[in-house]
Amino acid sequence: MPTITLPDGSQRAFDHAVSVADVAASIGAGLAKATVAGKVDGKLVDACELITHDATLQIITPKDEEGLEIIRHSCAHLVGHAVKQLYPTAKMVIGPVIDEGFYYDIAYERSFTPEDLAAIEKRMQQLIEKDYDVIKKMTPRAEVIDVFKARGEDYKLRLVEDMPDEQAMGLYYHEEYVDMCRGPHVPNTRFLKAFKLTKLSGAYWRGDAKNEQLQRVYGTAWADKKQLAAYIQRIEEAEKRDHRKIGKQLDLFHLQEEAPGMVFWHANGWTVYQVLEQYMRQVQRENGYSEIKTPQVVDRILWERSGHWSNYAENMFTTSSESRDYAVKPMNCPCHVQVFNQGLKSYRDLPLRLAEFGACHRNEPSGALHGIMRVRGFVQDDAHIFCTEDQVKKEAADFIKLTLDVYKDFGFTDVAMKLSTRPAKRVGSEELWDRAEGALADALNESGLEWEYQPGEGAFYGPKIEFTLRDCLGRNWQCGTLQYDPNLPERLDASYIAEDNARKRPVMLHRAILGSFERFIGMLIEHYAGVFPAWLAPTQAVIMNITDKQADFALQVEKSLNGSGFRAKSDLRNEKIGFKIREHTLLKVPYLLVIGDREVETQTVAVRTREGADLGSMPVAQFVELLTHAVSRRGRQESE
């Protein structure tokens, strides 16, 4: 006779075992209809799950985060149902939930086309309209093997082999289609109406390029059609903002097959890049960093000592010369320790902050490359702080403040901070971990802002702080990091003379604010849709004449603005002024200066913005003041 305790503290007693769905029905017909699953004593279970003992129960509906995840997982199974009806010889692999959606990996004799994707989606809609129940059966292992052998589902059999300790497994039946899963899943296909298949891509069995290639069908699913429509609108906006499209439109960069994952920066894009670098150089100089430069290619011996050769070799580009093996550096840390090790260091020299705009190369899989967001060659705003354990808290607190200030300059004010703590497999004493985590937590608390723990997500040698930016589309981008590391100084024999004249190891704090310049510029392009703030715009002002008579004055204005440190160009083409204005508006130039006879006579410029605002005529000196103010704000709003 189980007694069920609900989230509000109320209780319901039953004289027999009762399912989650039964409890929901006892509360109300509306809740019963909306029940996706339940959480019994904190564990997610199917709506059909019987409760035989006193328990706490939360009814899960599509409004709950868990409910939405269950809907997405069930949609992946529905993909399987549709695919097997349309392509009976296809073999289903895995279909997990991902951020805002799901995918299913499939083995088939030919590549799916966009027409196939549309056909699969249409069949899924037809299956949903049948409004059938999804049936779960806990099935003995031997019977599961028989089921998948009979259906020729080779990959499912391999997955069963991966779970030797599982003596019974959950099989979920969508009519004639059967799939294996721990669940839970929706009780009926009526919950799956708000879905859409989004794209096709390639994948490899177990994610290993050495294995056979599979096809991946991606989709998204939501609680209702309104949420789905909002998501589609957001994705369409993201496609308009795709940095690859805008990069071409604004002539910022290009990529080509002969150099996969390497960026060809054009003059406009390189201007943005240089503004970022000069800005970060100034910020670091003002905050006590010394800029250094270390080699690109380093002997294998150093990478062996640092541990990278044994743990990271497959991601490193290597070469040989005169019977010596070398690697192109994938990161800067070991080289920075070499700089620290030159000359005896005293505790009075600490903290020592070494910064480098370090060019790194990593042998990323070609399938993982994406525009300038995921590349093989990139530059980081990388720095390492060598300090004593007692200095960690202050250095971390100063870095947090600096990082948040930098993000504000780029227009990012919604920043999530997370502290990743000790993983199960780790080195170092518990006392060391306590002190390290405590110092970083205290530094985060000093910021006065909200932050959260990520238990078990730290590196094996130390905790770290991560900074995640939310852009104008609500997407999250993990950028900044502060990693506590007592391990590399030990491996590379870094030391300093302490106050008691003993030789001690420094703590090394790895830190980056932007991360990779390439990725950060890609983010900025999409965040601003190419409409860069004046300080970042490749061209800040363009001067246009109406007729040839104003050409000389236009050139004078261009020279004056460039002489004042701005990026200005003149457009003296024999084109109508309306054509010129439209063209430079599409190129997203912040300020458009028009010069006609009246402007020449009064020595003024008629100022328009790319948004179409007419600021009227003004002397060049007044425009310089206006542009100076716009540039000085960087990406901040007027109110900041």
Curated annotation (Swiss-Prot):
Q: Which Gene Ontology terms cover its molecular function?
A: ATP binding; metal ion binding; threonine-tRNA ligase activity; tRNA binding
Q: Start and end of every TGS domain?
A: 1-61
The UniProt entry's sequence similarity note says: Belongs to the class-II aminoacyl-tRNA synthetase family.
Top EC group? ligase
HAMAP family per UniProt:
Thr_tRNA_synth
Q: Can you supply one Gene Ontology CC term for this chain's record?
A: cytosol
InterPro entries attached here?
A: aa-tRNA-synt_IIb (IPR002314), aa-tRNA-synth_II (IPR006195), aa-tRNA-synth_II/BPL/LPL (IPR045864), Anticodon-bd (IPR004154), Anticodon-bd_dom_sf (IPR036621), Beta-grasp_dom_sf (IPR012675), TGS (IPR004095), TGS-like (IPR012676)
Q: What does the record say about how the cofactor binds?
A: Binds 1 zinc ion per subunit.
Query: What does the protein in this record do?
Result: Catalyzes the attachment of threonine to tRNA(Thr) in a two-step reaction: L-threonine is first activated by ATP to form Thr-AMP and then transferred to the acceptor end of tRNA(Thr). Also edits incorrectly charged L-seryl-tRNA(Thr).
Query: Which cofactors does it use?
Result: Zn(2+)
| Subunit | Homodimer.
Organism encoding this protein: Pseudomonas putida (strain W619)
UniProt: Zn(2+) binding residues: C333, H384, H510
Q: Which domain of life is it from?
A: Bacteria
Q: Give positions of region: Catalytic.
A: 242-533
Catalyzed reactions: tRNA(Thr) + L-threonine + ATP = L-threonyl-tRNA(Thr) + AMP + diphosphate + H(+)
UniProt key word Transcription regulation: no
What protein am I looking at?
Threonine--tRNA ligase
**Swiss-Prot/TrEMBL keywords:** Aminoacyl-tRNA synthetase, ATP-binding, Cytoplasm, Ligase, Metal-binding, Nucleotide-binding, Protein biosynthesis, RNA-binding, tRNA-binding, Zinc
Name the EC number(s).
Answer: 6.1.1.3
Give the location in the cell: Cytoplasm
GO BP term, example: threonyl-tRNA aminoacylation
